[in-house]
């Protein structure tokens, strides 16, 4: 499993918590994920917990790398590879030097976890047309902030949107027209867990060979 991170640091917007107060909120449903990875949480009120955003990012990263994840930072994805109407990889380049010819990376599955911009989904829409598995066939666009709804829909919206391409995290809500949530990250954790499980199950069955 490989993550290509455009920026120098990984973790998206989690570092800053809510408006740079370095605290994030998670619900009881996702608390077990942070517990498993050794990230401390403190109960705020029934059903809601607080975690230090710095500890959460670094803890998640450390444990993921320790378990085999490869991370390449300062690399942008500028295109996708398509073979027989299926995403078969991505096209990458250095984030700081985009005027040189890129490299292609083949993959059995690609996950668009580019956040609010859902960049890979938009690339498919631009290059192939409105063939995404959404109501419109295209990117529906992120709706205004509504944390309660967004936290539920982000897990439901985590799925395959084009053959070989899944969406997770805020990219999922952006593609399917779900609302944004602010500094509450329980749904994000559950979304990541769900997409990993879905892909693992298909790999075990040999569906992606």
Where are these regions (language model features)?
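Residues forming the flavin
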Residues: 1-29, 37-45, 49-209
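Core catalytic machinery and nucleic-acid-binding channels of phosphodiester-processing enzymes
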Residues: 33
């Amino acid at each position: 499993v490989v993550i290509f991170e455009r920026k120098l640091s990984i973790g998206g917007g989690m570092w800053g918590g809510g408006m740079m107060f370095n605290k994030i909120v998670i619900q009881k449903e996702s608390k077990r994920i942070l517990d498993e990875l050794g990230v401390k949480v403190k109960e705020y009120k029934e059903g809601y917990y607080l975690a230090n955003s710095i500890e959460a990012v670094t803890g998640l990263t450390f444990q993921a790398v320790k378990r085999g994840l490869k991370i390449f930072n300062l690399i942008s994805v500028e295109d996708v590879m398509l073979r027989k109407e299926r995403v078969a990889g991505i096209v990458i380049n250095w984030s700081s030097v985009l005027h040189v010819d890129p490299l292609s990376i083949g993959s059995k599955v690609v996950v668009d976890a580019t956040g609010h911009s859902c960049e890979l989904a938009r690339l498919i829409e631009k290059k192939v047309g409105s063939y995404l598995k959404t109501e419109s066939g295209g990117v529906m666009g992120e709706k205004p902030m509504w944390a309660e709804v967004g936290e539920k829909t982000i897990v439901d919206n985590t799925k395959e949107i084009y053959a070989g391409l899944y969406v997770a995290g805020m990219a999922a809500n952006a593609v399917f027209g779900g609302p944004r949530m602010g500094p509450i990250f329980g749904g994000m954790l559950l979304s990541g867990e769900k997409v990993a499980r879905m892909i693992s199950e298909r790999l075990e069955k040999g569906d992606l060979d």
